[in-house]
Amino acid sequence: IPGVDAGDEKAVKKAREGLKRQLPIRAIHYYKFRNNHRSSEDAVPESFLFQTTIDVDDVDYVDAALEKARELNCSNTIWKGKLLHLEYSARKKLHIDIRMPMGMTIEETQKAYCEAAGIPYDKSCITPERIIFITDKDSEIYRSKEWYGVLPDEEIKARREAFLKRGLTIDGKGTARYSLLAGDCKSPER
């Protein structure tokens, strides 16, 4: 990094973090927030993507996690066909984007996938406002045509109903204010 003493690990780390903060971002759970304010309270339930990103932050797990992601995607488990995207992160670790199994919350999905993949669970990745820094094309390993794709209306309805039947909101984020077992799922309060 120009102007930074390569022998000063602390200065190099600080400079890299500064460069990282200049990268564009992507929200991993929602595509819309009220008043353009990225927070849990302002996440618009109808904009829930039904996908999440597993963030492999320990370099010792990257190669094994990459192989396991491919293996799980082809397995006869709930993870079959769920892999949406693989990329190296800004710090050359790994992001694994997956479609959430029907009825599972972000936290449930993250915990179950990490267990199946044999990688550490990172609870900081389950917040509605979570973002990931976008890296260059060379960092992309795999991209499904379904990544950030709009799900069919019937699938969205089925996924929302699966949450509602559990007493959760349509995005699985919290407790529904009232139970809805039939009808539409348009109210942001549900």
Q: What residues fall within each predicted segment?
A:
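Short, well-ordered, mixed-charge alpha-helical segments that flank or form enzyme active sites
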Residues: L94-H95, Y142
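Short Gly/Ser/Thr- and Asp/Glu-enriched loop/turn motifs at secondary-structure junctions
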Residues: Y88-L94, I126-I131
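Signature for HUH/AEP ssDNA processing cores
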Residues: I1-K92, R99-E108, L168-T169, S179-G183
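DNA replication initiation modules
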Residues: K32-D60, M100-E189
